[in-house]
């Protein structure tokens, strides 16, 4: 009976050095999407990603095992195809990848055609903007949004461990924030105010969370923020997520210590929990990234 595993489970078991558990895996079942598919006429190789881990797992399909007809069918599976795969789990310590799956059966769960726009090459951000529904399948966006997920968890974990109360502040508000340009929420009839008064998309939860600070002492809000500055540059964000802590009975030194502790905690958390994503960013986006982050961790803020 095949044992269902995710790619993350396999790599984490390998990374933890748990050879006994890996050796115990013989027959395995995987589900995922084709990243690449190539063959030499008798043996083929599929890079499969199941969405649980940044790295792919290699599938090896053999004409002698599958038969001519099945081999030919599998060899035509395109990038983006969804597969259910069963096979033998094999450790390959001498190869580039630590393990692979020798396919014994493979089912096509979802097909794509020749027009599928993502191929084995780097695509520009401008091109990917035209196919936004497929961007999460690219390495860059996959890494970015996995990182955002992990970093959000780190932020909450840091403040919760410090005893802070998480406050949900409203997105729709009648309060302006520090003179920032704000988006107005209206109906089709602009003279008929939706709430009978001026209503805005929040530029900050600060005003709301300050009142909670005077009841709970240490609080924070972490959520979407909107700014309507007239800028269409690539570096301008009209919507982003912002952390806003408020602490009572504190001075500037307390504020700075909180910021420093939060920054270092989040960096450590990301480096530990997004190792492959951070390697990708360091190799293909900013080759100084890991050096700079480690510099922050290892250098006092007074001289960093």
Please tell me what each predicted stretch does.
Residues 1-304:
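Class II aminoacyl-tRNA synthetase catalytic cores and aaRS-like
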